[in-house]
UniProtKB/Swiss-Prot annotation:
Its biological purpose: Specific chaperone for cognate PE/PPE proteins. Plays an important role in preventing aggregation of PE/PPE dimers. Required for LipY and PE31/PPE18 secretion.
Superkingdom of this protein's organism: Bacteria
Protein's UniProt name: ESX-5 secretion-associated protein EspG5
Assembly and interaction partners: Interacts specifically with ESX-5-dependent PE/PPE proteins. Binds PPE33 and PPE18. Does not interact with EsxN. Monomer in solution.
Gene name of this polypeptide: espG5
C-alpha cells in the first residue's frame, strides 16, 4: 500500500491475510472469506522469516514488525463486528461454496472459480469491506449509510459479472411453504413452463412463471444477500435472504418477507429486480435481524 497514494485498499492472498491475523492475534473472520483460523503461539518470531513479510513491508502493509494502523483498524472490525452483511455472487449458478474438484486437497480454502464474495462489516460506526476473488482478498473502508447504499453495492457487484434489465413481470407475494413444495416438483420437470400449474394456481402469471423458470434452470448470474448480528459471544442470522437471479427473461428478485405480528405464515416476494425493489429486499434482510436496529446495535 503506497501511503502517498489516495488509494486505501490492500490486496493480499489467503496466506498473507493469515499472516495479518497472526500479527494482530485475530483468530478468525467471517467464514465466507474461507480464511484459515489462527491459533496464538508463544512467539511470532517465525513470521519475520516468512518471505511474505518482505512483500507486505514493500507494500506498506507492515511497517517494521507492526501492521499499518489503518489496515489494523480494518482487520479489527472484521475480527469482532457488530454486524456483517454478506453477498455471494456468481457467474452462472451459485454453488454456495461447494467446489466440484476431486483433486482438491483436504482442508482446502478455495472458493468456486465462478464466485466472488463480499463481506461488509460494521463495528461502531466504522464500516469495512472484504472482497474475496480467487485466492486474493481486498480490504478497504466502505461508505454505508442506509439500505439503499448496500443495495447499490450489491447491484454494482452483480453488474460487474453480468448485465441484465429487470424482468418484465409483476410483483407477487406467495406463501413460502407452498412455493417451496411447488418449486421442488417443478424442478423435477426441468422447470418446464407447461409444468408450472401449481405456481399458476398461487396467482403467479404465465409470464412470471416463464421468466422464473429461465432464471432458476440456467442463470447467467446470481447473488445471495444475508446478514448476521453479534451479541457478546452469540450470533444471529437474518430471517430473510435476498436472491437476485439473471435469466434470459431478465433479473428477478426473491426474498422472504418479514412476518407480521400475529401471522404464522411466511410469504415470499417475487418481483422484477429494479433498484427500488432490490433496496426493499435488502431492507427486509436487515429488518429481520434478531438483535435490534442494524445501524446502531452493538455486540457488547
Amino acid at each position: 500500500m503506497d501511503q502517498q497514494s489516495t488509494r486505501t485498499d490492500i490486496t493480499v492472498n489467503v496466506d498473507g491475510f493469515w499472516m495479518l491475523q497472526a500479527l494482530l492475534d485475530i483468530r478468525h473472520v467471517a467464514p465466507e472469506l474461507r480464511c484459515r483460523p489462527y491459533v496464538s503461539t508463544d512467539s511470532n518470531d517465525w513470521l519475520n522469516e516468512h518471505p511474505g513479510m518482505a512483500v507486505m513491508r514493500e507494500q506498506g502493509i507492515v511497517v517494521g514488525d507492526t501492521v499499518n494502523e489503518q489496515v489494523a483498524a480494518r482487520m479489527r472490525v472484521l475480527a469482532a463486528p457488530d454486524l456483517e452483511v454478506v453477498a455471494l455472487l456468481s457467474r452462472g449458478k451459485l454453488l454456495y461454496g461447494v467446489v466440484d474438484n476431486e483433486d482438491q486437497p483436504p482442508g482446502s480454502r478455495d472458493i468456486p472459480d465462478n464466485e466472488f464474495r463480499v463481506v461488509l462489516a460494521r463495528r461502531g460506526q466504522h464500516w469495512v469491506s472484504a472482497v474475496r476473488v480467487g485466492n486474493d482478498i481486498t480490504v478497504d473502508d466502505v461508505s454505508v449509510s442506509d439500505s439503499a447504499s448496500i443495495a447499490a453495492l450489491v447491484i454494482d457487484g452483480l453488474e460487474s459479472i453480468h448485465h441484465a434489465d429487470p424482468a418484465a413481470i409483476n410483483a407477487v407475494n406467495v406463501p413460502l411453504e407452498e412455493m417451496l413444495e411447488a418449486t421442488k416438483s417443478w424442478q423435477e420437470s426441468g422447470f418446464n413452463v407447461f409444468s408450472g400449474g401449481d405456481l399458476r394456481r398461487m396467482g403467479i402469471s404465465a409470464s412470471t412463471v416463464a421468466a422464473l423458470g429461465q432464471a432458476l434452470s440456467d442463470p447467467a448470474a446470481e447473488v445471495a444477500v444475508y446478514a448476521r448480528q453479534y451479541r457478546d459471544d452469540a450470533k444471529g442470522p437474518s430471517a430473510s435472504v435476498l436472491s437476485l437471479k439473471d435469466g434470459s427473461g431478465g433479473r428477478i428478485a426473491l426474498y422472504q418477507q418479514a412476518r407480521t405480528a400475529g401471522s404464522g405464515e411466511a410469504w415470499l416476494a417475487i418481483c422484477p429486480a429494479t433498484p427500488q425493489l432490490v433496496q426493499v429486499g435488502v431492507k427486509t434482510v436487515l429488518d429481520t435481524l434478531p438483535y435490534g436496529e442494524w445501524k446502531t446495535h452493538s455486540r457488547v
